[in-house]
């Protein structure tokens, strides 16, 4: 009897061990077998669904672990966890994982509606976002030690100094705090804290570990004005584009970005960056100044997007990220503070024309059944009033474009003797035209003969028969909206798209 009891106890303990989550660098490792138990055990749980091959996941890993360690050291009840979605496909499907990394926040074990994590990829961003979701919008600062701890805890922190924390201004401050995900806010009425930071009347101060160190808010305290003040001052004058900073860059409200492509190894690196920073001072809140290390392998796609080669750097380009992306190029290659300032000012005044990339026209562009278009000959060919022109806009790296290539070649062969039908293709990563905005690959458009510069989208089957029916119907059978096209970012190796936030970055760059 005793032996049976001991055996049962051993089995129970072993089973308990089997269900318990392991930890890696303070991050819980979750599986289907322990997911529900860990949700029940932790009131606040942030879960990353990742893939071992995902570059963005690898870049996030040290910051994610750092955030987990920081919260654990503070004695917080917030825990961080991760799930290998390639191994735990049922969990990934259950929680709608369509890209890597996908990060979801579970509160009180609620599996019905976990909140999507949308902030930055640095440890401070993660910690601040979680604290905003689990505590007050602003921490009450009773003394200087508490204030110093808050300021030291993050790259950027905001403190409201109000002698009456129930005042209308203080309430507006709290509304701004509630609307800001990724920055810690503190609220104080302590004369000790006022004195420590040399604040002599009610006000708001943004503290930061870069540039001028602090910014004092001036004017009437309203939620909208505070948010505008924070937007203008929370980022460095010049911010480097990295995996970690990308969400801050593209998640902000400033949609005009000027980019300095500069090799970190350049002899005049510091001087060029200093001039760029000097120019940035006059455009805070209007234009975001971004430095891109043109030597870094991860940034080569961005160079390609702007039609740049490494040997052409340093170089400056400007882009607007509204509904339609538009690029601009300085007339001069001189990268002085004065030259960059003048370029930005002329852009804001509407005096700069968009820059459209074009390859050189190949000598044999029209010798094959499928004609080769570049920016320089597009208008002449596509809008020839005597021709019906069917164009594939492709990217060399796009898997679906590669699959389409032999079919498109057969289509060219089929119509090579037709005098009024032209089958063509254009590499849209190296050529841009004002008449067509390409948002996905492959994009197929038909330019029928006749006046009026008509453009018809093709959204039918990507088969030879489908294309023939479309052409023989005069662009009717298969015409439609572009809702079936592949994403610009399109990952070729994985079954799932990579991380939505990073996809947006590449969509916009």
UniProtKB/Swiss-Prot annotation:
Residues annotated as domain Thioredoxin: 19-135, 347-476
Residue ranges crossing the lipid bilayer per the database entry: none
EC number: 5.3.4.1
Keywords, sorted A to Z: Cell membrane, Chaperone, Disulfide bond, Endoplasmic reticulum, Isomerase, Membrane, Phosphoprotein, Redox-active center, Repeat, Signal
Residue ranges the record marks as coiled coil: none
GO molecular function, one term: protein disulfide isomerase activity
Secretion signal span: 1-18
Paired cysteines (S-S): 54-57, 398-401
Superkingdom: Eukaryota
Modified residues (N6-succinyllysine): 223, 272
Keyword Lipid biosynthesis: no
Subcellular location: Endoplasmic reticulum; Endoplasmic reticulum lumen; Melanosome; Cell membrane
Catalytic activity: Catalyzes the rearrangement of -S-S- bonds in proteins
Residue window of motif Prevents secretion from ER: 506-509
Any one annotated GO CC term: endoplasmic reticulum
Positions bearing the site annotation: Contributes to redox potential value: 55-56, 399-400
Disordered: annotated span: 471-509
Oligomeric form and interacting partners: Heterodimer; heterodimerizes with the protein microsomal triglyceride transfer MTTP. Homodimer. Monomers and homotetramers may also occur. Interacts with P4HA2, forming a heterotetramer consisting of 2 alpha subunits (P4HA2) and 2 beta (P4HB), where P4HB plays the role of a structural subunit; this tetramer catalyzes the formation of 4-hydroxyproline in collagen. Also constitutes the structural subunit of the microsomal triacylglycerol transfer protein MTTP in mammalian cells. Stabilizes both enzymes and retain them in the ER without contributing to the catalytic activity. Binds UBQLN1.
Name this protein carries in UniProt: Protein disulfide-isomerase
Organism the protein comes from: Oryctolagus cuniculus (Rabbit)
Protein's gene: P4HB
